[in-house]
């Protein structure tokens, strides 16, 4: 599936989910091991982070709810990084410049990765943005969130606390 087709689907379906209350689900299935790019252009595989609790968030500069969720996820990262949380914000912009402009306006400490071809959201079954996946230390997707509203922060904190306490 080409990136333009994925973006068309996300633009059509995404706003419906993104502006309403977020949808949360609890599941347990292995995380797809897809390759993404670092800011320097190096390739990393998501499985490289196995052994940590991971929050993977798919976002784009044009996604209105992402402008609110991105800083909130950075706060979560700062609050839980010493307990083993890694936040991976996977940008899906086709033009890297668009992401760079967004990132300059939103200082952050979380890890930003890039997937302009849209392989990783397809592997995760992303249906709207932002979409987040909480992964346990064994590499299993345990919780998913589609969309974003401020009231979801308590859910994130509860789920992260649960996962970081598991050994």
Where in this protein do the model-derived segments appear?
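Positively charged n-region of N-terminal signal peptides that target proteins for export
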Residues: 1-6
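Thiol/disulfide oxidoreductase modules built on the thioredoxin-like
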Residues: 101-109, 116-161
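Short active-site neighborhood of thiol/selenol oxidoreductases, capturing the structured segment around
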Residues: 47-63
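Conserved redox-active cysteine motifs that mediate thiol-disulfide chemistry
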Residues: 58-75
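N-terminal "domain-start" segment that seeds a small globular fold
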Residues: 21-47
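Thiol-based oxidoreductase modules, predominantly thioredoxin-like and allied folds used
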Residues: 85-96, 108-117
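Bacterial N-terminal signal peptides
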Residues: 8-18
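Hydrophobic beta-strand core positions in alpha/beta domains
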Residues: 55-57, 87-89, 133-134
């Amino acid at each position: 599936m080409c990136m333009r087709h994925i973006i068309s689907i996300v633009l059509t379906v995404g706003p419906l989910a993104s502006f309403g209350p977020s949808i949360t689900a609890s599941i347990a299935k292995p995380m797809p091991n897809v390759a993404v790019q670092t800011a320097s252009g190096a390739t990393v595989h998501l499985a490289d982070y196995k052994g940590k609790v991971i929050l993977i968030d798919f976002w784009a500069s044009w996604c209105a709810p992402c402008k609110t969720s991105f800083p909130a996820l950075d706060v979560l990262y700062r609050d839980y990084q010493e307990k083993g949380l890694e936040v991976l914000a996977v940008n899906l912009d086709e033009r890297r410049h668009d992401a760079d402009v967004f990132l300059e306006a939103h200082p952050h400490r979380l890890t930003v990765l890039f997937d302009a071809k849209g392989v990783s959201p397809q592997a995760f079954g992303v249906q709207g943005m932002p979409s987040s996946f909480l992964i346990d230390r064994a590499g299993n997707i345990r919780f998913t969130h589609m969309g974003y509203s401020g009231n979801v922060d308590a859910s994130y904190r509860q789920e992260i606390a649960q996962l970081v306490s598991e050994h």
